Amino acid sequence: MAKQQVHAVEAQAATQSDFTQLLEREFRPKTDQARAAVEHAVQTLAEQALTQSITISDDAYKSIAAIIAQIDRKLSEQINLILHHDDYQALESAWRGLNHLVSNTETDEHLKIRVMDVSKAELHRTMRRYKGLAWDQSPLFKQIYEQEYGQLGGEPYGCIVADYYFDHTPPDVDLLGSIAKVAAAAHTPFVTGAAPSVLQMESWQELANPRDLTKIFTQNLEYTAWNSLRNTEDARYVGLAMPRFLARLPYGAKTNPVDQFDFEEDTNGSDHSRYGWANAAYAMGVNINRSFKQYGWCSLIRGVESGGTVDNLPCHTFPTDDGGVDMKCPTEIAISDRREAELSKNGFIPLVHRKNTDHATFIGAQSLQKPAEYHDPDATANANLSARLPYLFACSRFAHYLKCIVRDKIGAFKEREDMQRWFNEWIMNYVDADPANSSQDTKARRPLAAAEVLVEDVEGNPGYYQAKFFLRPHFQLEGLTVSLRLVTKLPSIKEAA
């Protein structure tokens, strides 16, 4: 036994000496530090050679390359396990979504992004302690309302983008209802994500399977609380975006190279879970910020030609089983026009991918609220209008302005007629003088087609007034029904005859 150990030591020493000479001939170390590094490397290689984990040849470069390749394979196996773990994917999704929002937003003294690090579970535990009439004592209310909107000199929040996913379960409905109250009080729309489980699905890839989405909500008792939430006034301040969008290309030499080592991420075009996705609420947040930066209003946030497009999405192509090449849909699933209309009708904001391109579009921007139906057609039309986010953003901003204006006017000597005249002159700054002929750019900067303000005295309370603002925004095209007819004469020609 002792002789075997002696022979092993002698063999190791001989191997180290020979390989040291090979490396010195190849690399030619010029300093003592370099020679020491070579000696240390040789010792490590010799130990691995004796364990029969590697084979050393006379070609030093080839031996080292083989060793590095073996290390890269081991690292790749471990990194793949980390990258595709559920906890890591959730963490990466949050950071890449936030990076998408910040990188695509041009901030300045008027457009600011503030980040609050609070998990959905933590927020639910907190809001649960302030249920009922105590909701206005919650930390969220104080943060969003009191510290900004309700504070002299405060800067009201224009929108809240939350990296959460909600479904119809009682805890989610309870939390969403509490948040909606705060958002409505502060006139700050709340945009977040919808989970596929809200439609009883494991993944959004199942979205094409149901024949009728509306029946899921109307013929299932599980959605009683959800439908009740949709019927509230506060629900108009909630927007649920879906599905997720691709946050990055898979790592690989031909897709997303890694400089540190040779790494190929283990992905499969058919395996949805092995990709990195981000919340669609971030994409909607980018559109909202872009509209505000360009026009000062958040009205152009939906539609292909009106600010709803999300550009430069990662596009990953992969070989198919039949020998062809396919592209992974960067929005989880391609949504048809019919399905998009169904989703909007049921209170969602779908992100629709344009086929064979790297961009997608928010066609609609419907809030969670289900518009009420009245006997009066005008009242029903008003309800439909107030349930759409582009119009709500404009009204919310006017609410922010008005609170600041009224706060500054307190104590001034103003009669009712003076207040009414002043408000009407002020509101006309945001009314398009010629809405029938003005450009889309003008409509975006002046979001109102007409406006009127009425100020009334409050009986029994001198110095107090009640102001009513009537705002008519520019209507955005929601749909167009086309009929084709074969005729011998055009209607205009027949009328002329």
Predicted regions mapped to residue ranges:
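N-terminal-proximal low-complexity accessory segments that begin disordered
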Residues: M1-A121, R125-R128
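Generic, well-ordered alpha-helical scaffold segments in large soluble proteins
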Residues: K74, Q78, A94-L101, V182, ...
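Long, charged, glycine-rich C-terminal linkers/tails
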Residues: S93-L98, E109-K120, P435-V458
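Core mixed alpha/beta domains of very large multi-subunit molecular machines
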Residues: W95-R114, H124-G154, P171-A180
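Extended, regular secondary-structure scaffolds
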Residues: L133, E148-P330
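Long, contiguous, structured domain-core segments that constitute the functional module of a protein
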Residues: F261-W422, V482
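Short, hydrophobic/π-rich interface segment
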Residues: D418-S438, T442-A444
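C-terminal edge-of-domain segments
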Residues: E452-A497
